[in-house]
Regions:
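Short amphipathic alpha-helix segments
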Residues: 19-33
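Short amphipathic alpha-helices in soluble, non-transmembrane regions
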Residues: 27, 62-69
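A short linear hydrophobic-aromatic micro-motif
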Residues: 34-40, 78-79
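Short, low-order "capping/linker" segments at domain edges
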Residues: 87-99
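Solvent-exposed alpha-helices and their adjacent loops that cap or buttress functional pockets
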Residues: 2-6, 29, 40-44, 74
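Conserved short beta-strand edge segments in small beta-sheet-based binding/regulatory domains
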Residues: 72-84
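Helix N-cap motif at beta-to-alpha junctions
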Residues: 53-59
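Short glycine-/aliphatic-rich beta-strand segments at the starts of folded cytosolic domains
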Residues: 4-15
Length: 99
């Protein structure tokens, strides 16, 4: 696991619109102390997936802000928060970020 993110929760949301993802991640970053770890464009659609890191409470606040901002702009495909990611989850997240 990257020492930079050790002990941090992971928040992930996916929207049908890549443009809406950037608006939503901006809202998330302004709402709470989170680090945007990556944006992954969907290969088969115009959407994208955003990964962010921080304390559980900050990721929760950021996720709420992101989804509230995204809702009028795009369909929310999925979202989740992993409070204490396993080494396997950390490895999988790194693989999607560093490709």
């Amino acid at each position: 696991m990257s020492e930079e993110y050790k002990g941090m929760a992971i928040g992930v949301f996916e929207l049908e619109s890549e443009c809406a993802c950037f608006v939503a991640l901006d809202a998330a970053a302004k709402a709470a102390d989170v680090k945007i770890q990556g944006v992954e464009r969907n290969r088969l659609s115009a959407g994208a997936c955003v990964k962010m890191r921080g304390t559980v409470s900050n990721v929760n606040a950021a996720m709420e802000a992101a989804l509230r901002t995204a809702e009028p702009l795009s369909k929310i495909v999925s979202h989740t928060i992993i409070a204490a990611p396993s080494e396997e989850a950390e490895t999988a997240i790194r693989m999607t970020i560093n490709k």
